[in-house]
Design a protein with these regions (language model features):
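Short, positively charged, Gly/Tyr-enriched micro-motifs
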Residues: 37-83
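A short acidic-Thr-Gly-centered motif at the start of a beta-strand
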Residues: 97-105, 172-185, 200
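Active-site-proximal, Lys/Arg-enriched surface segment
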Residues: 79-146, 150
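Dynamic "connector" segments at or just before major functional cores
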Residues: 1-50
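Conserved small/polar residues in nucleotide/adenosyl-binding loops
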Residues: 205-211
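Short, conserved catalytic/metal-binding motifs centered on acidic residues
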Residues: 44-46, 71-76, 110-118, 145, ...
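Hydrophobic, well-ordered beta-alpha structural blocks that scaffold small-molecule cofactor pockets
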Residues: 162, 200-203
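Electropositive, glycine- and tryptophan-enriched low-complexity nucleic-acid-binding patches
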Residues: 134-181
Length: 214
């Protein structure tokens, strides 16, 4: 079985699980309770399979996938808002943990860490929540991710809405990996880009794991 097919089946199984749904639905008393065209699992699969085409084209394509009556883009957007972002976070972490990780460097996994910034849609809600100062014109997010270089996949990410300290996010991510049952006993070498070195980060990683700081 191809890896892509296995991941899709794993995601479908998780998204269909009642316990998983109850953790990640915004309003457990009313969301996805009545019989509707779109189920929780449907919305998950739509969101993951979105190719960033115009909304109505994506809706038409997904309607054909469901072999059901045509579903509007507005209906998909409304249904997506009923699911917490934590659902996708857990799906990402679980599928990454189950992926093959056979390629190593002299027995070590090579993990590279880097950060990025991005802009969010300039809506009143996001501007109110994520603009930290009056001078902020556009709501932004900050993310730091860990990439398994030899196995070519992301294994962990940390997001912060607004301006963040990349070193602090990297430390939290390292702690999460170090405590994760899938990774904690694996020999690892972590590689950090030039924006990460500092006295605190060097001291922290030196005590925690083998590290290369650019």
């Amino acid at each position: 079985m191809k890896a892509e097919t296995r991941f899709i089946r794993q995601i479908q199984k998780m998204a269909s699980d009642v316990e998983f749904q109850s953790k990640h639905i915004r309003d457990g008393e009313k969301d996805f309770k009545r019989t509707r065209k779109l189920t929780f699992s449907d919305v998950i699969m739509y969101t993951i399979g979105n190719t960033r085409s115009p909304l109505e084209l994506e809706a038409q394509r997904f309607s054909k996938y469901l072999t059901a009556d045509e579903i509007s883009g507005a209906a998909l957007c409304k249904a997506r808002q009923k699911i917490k972002y934590t659902a996708f976070e857990e799906l990402f972490e679980q599928t990454a943990a189950s992926a093959p990780k056979d390629k190593r460097f002299h027995g070590y996994h090579l993990y590279a860490v880097d950060g990025m910034k991005g802009e969010l849609p300039k809506t009143p809600e996001l501007s109110t929540k994520y603009c930290e100062t009056e001078k902020c014109k556009t709501p932004v997010f900050h993310a730091v991710s860990t990439f398994d270089i030899l196995n070519e996949m992301f294994i962990r990410s940390k997001f912060h809405f607004g301006i963040a300290d990349e070193r602090e996010l990297a430390g939290k991510m390292i702690d999460a990996v170090a405590q994760d049952v899938y990774y904690k006993d694996e020999p690892q070498i972590w590689i950090f880009d030039r924006g990460f070195p500092s006295l605190s980060s060097v001291s922290y990683t030196h005590l925690t794991l083998p590290t290369i700081l650019r």
